[in-house]
Regions:
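Membrane-interface helix-loop-helix junctions at boundaries between adjacent transmembrane segments
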Residues: 128-209
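A beta-strand-loop signature enriched in Asp, Gly, Thr, and Trp
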Residues: 274-325
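C-terminal ends of transmembrane helices
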Residues: 42-48, 114-125, 162-172, 258-266, ...
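N-terminal signal-anchor module of multipass membrane proteins
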Residues: 1-107, 383
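Long hydrophobic alpha-helical segments that form multi-pass transmembrane helix bundles
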Residues: 172-257
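Structural signature of hydrophobic alpha-helical transmembrane segments
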Residues: 96-110, 147-156, 239-253, 295-307
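Loop-to-transmembrane alpha-helix initiation sites
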Residues: 154, 175-180, 298-306, 328-330, ...
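Hydrophobic, membrane-inserted alpha-helices
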Residues: 113-118, 133-142, 157-164, 254-262, ...
Length: 385
């Protein structure tokens, strides 16, 4: 690493003002700050709250995503071999290797397109490159079906980065979660590629691994089966472990629980927001079940679909979620409740977490405003007394 540090110091003058490559200063600073702590200090007094800066936050979230990512890769291979009837004779390496080769291109496209736009935008605006897309670049591939074409994913990443992030001012200024923006773009632009029973299992062999399935092969998700009024073919145990069709990173409750522990232990995610999402979903599910409006049990709403993934990774986004302590409770509860409302009231769209987080992001500033104004009014009355 010292050799790399010395090399960067050697070429750095070329990218500084007056250097031959000054036009690419933002790109160089982006790579340098990604590898090392930036060589800058505050010129005036600074208030340091803790040692966690934005780069460390992003790094911890990326680490927390690894269990869901790795299990998602394995499950992609698992579903392919299971559909072909060759799961019993396949080795772990074959199953995971197929899933790895199927998911890797989506990760590469997400990062190449998203970071490419971020680099170009920083060059155009003469700004520093931010680390925010390091997390979004993994989340976006994890919340789409495995059969999503790469060109659709590229369009979604471009739309999300430009219209959900950069036009608001970049990292820390966006009001909508970038991954939610990408998912909504895909769902409303290409609904047939994001729903139904033909998009959840990879159907083509890759470099000799996996199986080529018939074009007419279908595999519905358990949540989709429940929405159609039939019992899911997968057991509750398989649903919790994650051996079910679904979006790449959303199937395993156990993997997501490990992710949640990491985020809560590091203090990056708020337990108030995360817990309130689950509370809102459970309360609303119990209400609908008591009224006889749905046969789906409350725990099925939690373990199926993208509820857990959305509650852990997307609802807790510190930029787009509510920031006041009381507001976090209302914000999370609203998201959980809306997710179940959409699932029950709209059978044609069994997954409601995406819209729930979108509306939660929309109302987060209003929630914070109401909480702050309530505190001001209460203190004013106390002062008068």
């Amino acid at each position: 690493m010292s050799a790399l540090r010395n090399y960067l110091n050697k070429i750095k003058p070329n990218f500084q003002k007056g250097g031959k490559l000054h036009a690419f200063e933002s790109v160089f600073d982006g790579f340098e700050s990604f590898l090392y702590v930036p060589n800058t200090t505050a010129k005036s007094g600074a208030s340091i709250h803790d040692s966690i800066d934005s780069k460390r936050i992003m790094s911890f979230v990326v680490i927390a995503l690894i269990p869901a990512l790795l299990f998602g890769m394995y499950n992609v291979g698992y579903q392919n071999f299971k559909a072909a009837g060759t799961l019993d004779t396949a080795s772990f390496i074959e199953v995971f290797g197929f899933g790895f080769l199927a998911v890797l291109p989506k990760l590469l496209v997400s990062y190449i397109v998203g970071l490419g736009i971020e680099f170009a935008w920083a060059q155009w605006k003469h700004e520093e490159i931010q680390e925010g897309y390091l997390v979004s670049g993994i989340i976006i591939p994890l919340i789409i079906p495995i059969s999503t074409p790469l060109w659709m994913l590229a369009l979604a990443c471009a739309f999300a980065v430009i219209f959900c992030k950069e036009i608001f001012g970049g990292t820390g200024m966006n009001i909508f979660n970038v991954a939610v923006g990408a998912r909504m773009f895909l769902f409303f632009s290409y609904p047939l590629a994001m729903s139904g029973d033909k998009v959840w299992v990879a159907k083509d062999a890759i470099f000799g691994l996996g199986n080529t399935l018939p074009d007419g092969f279908t595999a519905a998700t358990p949540l989709g089966q429940l929405a159609q009024g039939s019992m899911p073919s997968a057991s509750l145990c398989d649903s919790i472990i994650g051996f079910i069709p679904g979006c790449i990173g959303e199937t395993s409750v156990i993997a997501i629980a490990i992710d949640a522990i990491i985020l809560l232990w590091t203090g990056i995610a708020s337990w108030k927001t995360m817990g309130s999402v689950f509370a809102g979903g459970i309360v609303m599910a119990l209400i609908f079940q008591a009224l006889g409006m749905t046969p789906i049990a409350w725990y099925e709403h939690i373990v199926l679909g993208g509820f857990c993934f959305g509650a852990v990774f997307m609802a807790t986004d510190p930029v787009t979620s509510a920031r006041t302590e009381k507001g976090k409770y209302f914000y999370g509860f609203i998201i959980g409740a809306i997710a179940v409302i959409v699932r029950v009231m709209n059978p044609g769209y069994p997954e409601g977490m995406m819209l729930a987080i979108f509306f939660g992001n929309m109302f987060a500033p209003l929630i914070d405003y109401c909480v702050v104004q309530s505190n001001i009014s209460r203190r004013a009355k106390r002062a008068i007394k």
